[in-house]
UniProtKB/Swiss-Prot annotation:
It is a multi-pass membrane protein. GO terms for biological process: intracellular protein transmembrane transport; protein secretion; protein transport by the Sec complex. It is found in: Cell membrane. Keywords: Cell membrane, Membrane, Protein transport, Translocation, Transmembrane, Transmembrane helix, Transport. InterPro entries: SecG (IPR004692). The gene is secG. PANTHER family: PROTEIN-EXPORT MEMBRANE PROTEIN SECG. This is Probable protein-export membrane protein SecG. The chain crosses the membrane at residues 3-23, 52-72. One of its GO terms (cellular component) is plasma membrane. One of its GO terms (molecular function) is protein-transporting ATPase activity.
Length: 133
């Protein structure tokens, strides 16, 4: 699979270079690089040279897109290799009822509050309902 991917990638590079070359060779009123080699006339490939270059460019661009999509299909990530299932299984194994097991910060806070000595009058105010003198 890797060898096929490398071969298609190499072919894609060649097609890219051909597309660039063909686009540069096409003349637009004799201004392009094609005019430099043929003196501005369209007689390099006969009377239909522009249509030949244009059609060849279309074919190469189509080949470029086809190879690009095929290469993307070859190199796509696999659907589900079991990694998702393994992660879900691990999560299920380590899942705990969080409301029954408070975090360490809550336990520390509970211990600090239990060590806090409240004045007896304060406890009496709340416990017996007596008023403040």
């Amino acid at each position: 699979m890797a060898v096929l991917s490398v071969m298609i990638l190499s072919l894609l590079v060649v097609v890219c270079l051909l597309v660039v070359t063909l686009v540069l060779l096409q003349t637009e009123e004799g201004d392009g690089l094609g005019g430099m080699f043929s003196g501005g006339s369209r007689s390099a490939f006969g009377s239909r040279s522009a249509s030949v270059l244009t059609k060849t460019s279309y074919v190469m661009v189509g080949l470029f897109f086809g190879l690009t999509f095929f290469l993307a299909l070859l190199n796509r990530a696999p659907d589900d290799t079991g990694l998702q299932k393994a992660a879900q299984q691990k999560q299920a194994e380590t899942a705990v009822e969080w409301w029954k097991h408070p975090p360490k910060k809550v336990l520390v806070l509970q211990r600090l509050l239990s060590l806090l000595v409240l004045p007896q009058e304060f406890l009496g105010l709340w416990g017996s309902g007596s008023s403040v003198p």
